[in-house]
Amino acid sequence: MAKATTIKIKLLSTADTGYFYVTTKNSRTMTDKMTKTKYDPVAKKHVEFKEAKIK
């Protein structure tokens, strides 16, 4: 079987609340770490989320 091109990643909040989103990314086209601005319900505002590994 071939290696999958999409991998699951965890987007961890930079507000240090421990809140995270799980999403997928194409590892061949997006080689650098992903960052997105999304809503953190614990902090109750939009913050930047950075990519972290799923354990």
Swiss-Prot record:
<keyword id="KW-0689">Ribosomal protein</keyword>
<dbReference type="InterPro" id="IPR018264">
    <property type="entry name" value="Ribosomal_bL33_CS"/>
</dbReference>
<dbReference type="GO" id="GO:0006412">
    <property type="term" value="P:translation"/>
</dbReference>
<dbReference type="InterPro" id="IPR038584">
    <property type="entry name" value="Ribosomal_bL33_sf"/>
</dbReference>
<dbReference type="GO" id="GO:0003735">
    <property type="term" value="F:structural constituent of ribosome"/>
</dbReference>
<dbReference type="Pfam" id="PF00471">
    <property type="entry name" value="Ribosomal_L33"/>
</dbReference>
<keyword id="KW-0687">Ribonucleoprotein</keyword>
<protein>
    <recommendedName>
        <fullName>Large ribosomal subunit protein bL33</fullName>
    </recommendedName>
</protein>
<dbReference type="GO" id="GO:0022625">
    <property type="term" value="C:cytosolic large ribosomal subunit"/>
</dbReference>
<dbReference type="InterPro" id="IPR001705">
    <property type="entry name" value="Ribosomal_bL33"/>
</dbReference>
<dbReference type="InterPro" id="IPR011332">
    <property type="entry name" value="Ribosomal_zn-bd"/>
</dbReference>
<comment type="similarity">
    <text>Belongs to the bacterial ribosomal protein bL33 family.</text>
</comment>
